[in-house]
């Protein structure tokens, strides 16, 4: 049984561990086969082959245990989403594996149940079970984590037309996601909480109602992005320059270093491209650009 899962951008500014946007920039393909040997076998290039250290394998192990499935399985993973760039690579493998296992064994899991198993696979990648990326890998579109325990996910109905431009720097850091999560402050002030809530509610409202100005205002973060800025020193300059060219907004994609830019027909697209190049050259950082669109839904 084969399933695919697309890349995603978590957080979208103020929505740390809450919001995620699935997009069609890249995808992983996962094939799950029954295997008469015991246990879980993993195959694929450039990935952990120990199932306990692999997000797809860890998710699969939980399902087999919880559903009392005695047969072994083989998981073949074709990685299309580059790892370590804030594009939901680890979560995509887990989500695709869960969807494939659900179909293979006809388990009839709900979307939220699939998110539950997928998010626990993330422990293999960063040490914590966070549901944001995997929720868009199961539902598609832009998702909101209503509750983590029990898992409750809401898919937002988007009424704003925009395109996506990903600025993907060639920056790689060992254990980057784990380090990025360690930078998030454990305590914030009431003023910081109020501002963050204002931004998040504005962003969600703007996406649902199609209010461009609300999205532009809302896609700004005063807590997590600020705490992580030393990882991405180019970010504020890049964001300022693309907004000067009437981009809707920009944010760090997940744990970075990729920057997600939203633009529309009011934006100066060529001006955005020039601005990106100017800023990244000034920081002596090589990068690639990837145009994308929202991956709305999966057919399973």
From Swiss-Prot:
Keywords: Amino-acid biosynthesis, ATP-binding, Cytoplasm, Kinase, Nucleotide-binding, Threonine biosynthesis, Transferase
Major location category of this protein: cytoplasm
Alphabetized InterPro entries for the sequence: GHMP_kinase_C_dom, GHMP_kinase_C_sf, GHMP_kinase_N_dom, GHMP_knse_ATP-bd_CS, Homoserine_kinase, Ribosomal_Su5_D2-typ_SF, Ribsml_uS5_D2-typ_fold_subgr
Swiss-Prot/TrEMBL catalytic activity: L-homoserine + ATP = O-phospho-L-homoserine + ADP + H(+)
EC number(s) from the headed UniProt entry: 2.7.1.39
One MF annotation (Gene Ontology) recorded for this entry: homoserine kinase activity
Function: Catalyzes the ATP-dependent phosphorylation of L-homoserine to L-homoserine phosphate.
Gene3D superfamilies in alphabetical order: 3.30.230.10, GHMP kinase, C-terminal domain
Example of a GO cellular component annotation carried by this entry: cytoplasm
Protein's name according to its UniProt entry: Homoserine kinase
Pfam family, one: GHMP_kinases_C
Entry's Gene Ontology BP terms: threonine biosynthetic process
HAMAP family: Homoser_kinase
Gene field: thrB
Pathway per the UniProt entry: Amino-acid biosynthesis; L-threonine biosynthesis; L-threonine from L-aspartate: step 4/5
Organism of origin: Picrophilus torridus (strain ATCC 700027 / DSM 9790 / JCM 10055 / NBRC 100828 / KAW 2/3)
Subcellular location: Cytoplasm
Family: Belongs to the GHMP kinase family. Homoserine kinase subfamily.
Domain of life of the organism encoding this protein: Archaea
Alphabetical list of SUPFAM superfamilies matching this protein: GHMP Kinase, C-terminal domain, Ribosomal protein S5 domain 2-like
Chain positions recorded as ATP binding sites: 82-92
PROSITE patterns per the UniProt record, alphabetical: GHMP_KINASES_ATP (PS00627)
């Amino acid at each position: 049984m084969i399933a695919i899962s697309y890349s995603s951008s978590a957080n979208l500014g103020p929505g740390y561990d809450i919001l995620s946007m699935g997009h069609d920039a890249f995808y992983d393909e996962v094939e799950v086969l029954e295997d008469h040997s015991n246990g879980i076998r993993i195959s694929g290039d450039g990935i952990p082959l120990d199932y306990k250290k692999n997000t797809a394998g860890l998710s699969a192990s939980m399902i087999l245990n919880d559903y009392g499935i005695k047969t072994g399985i083989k998981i073949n993973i074709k990685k299309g989403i580059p790892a370590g760039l804030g594009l939901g690579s680890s979560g995509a493998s887990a989500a695709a594996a869960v969807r494939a296992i659900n179909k293979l064994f006809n388990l009839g899991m709900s979307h939220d149940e699939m998110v539950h198993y997928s998010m626990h696979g993330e422990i293999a990648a960063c040490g914590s079970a966070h549901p944001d990326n995997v929720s868009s890998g199961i539902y598609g579109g832009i998702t909101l984590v209503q509750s983590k325990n029990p898992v409750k996910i809401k898919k937002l109905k988007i009424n704003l037309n925009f395109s996506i431009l990903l600025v993907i720097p060639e920056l790689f850091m060992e254990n980057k996601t784990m380090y990025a999560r360690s930078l998030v402050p454990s305590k914030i002030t009431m003023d910081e909480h109020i501002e963050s809530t204002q931004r998040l509610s504005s962003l969600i409202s703007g996406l649902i109602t199609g209010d461009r100005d609300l999205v532009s205002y809302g896609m700004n973060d005063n807590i997590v992005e600020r705490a992580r800025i030393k990882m991405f020193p180019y970010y504020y300059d890049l964001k300022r320059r693309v907004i000067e060219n009437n981009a809707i907004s920009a944010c760090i994609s997940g744990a970075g270093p990729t920057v997600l830019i939203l633009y529309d027909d009011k934006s100066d697209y060529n001006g955005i491209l020039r601005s990106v190049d100017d800023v990244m050259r000034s920081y002596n950082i090589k990068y690639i650009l990837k145009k994308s669109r929202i991956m709305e839904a999966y057919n399973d």
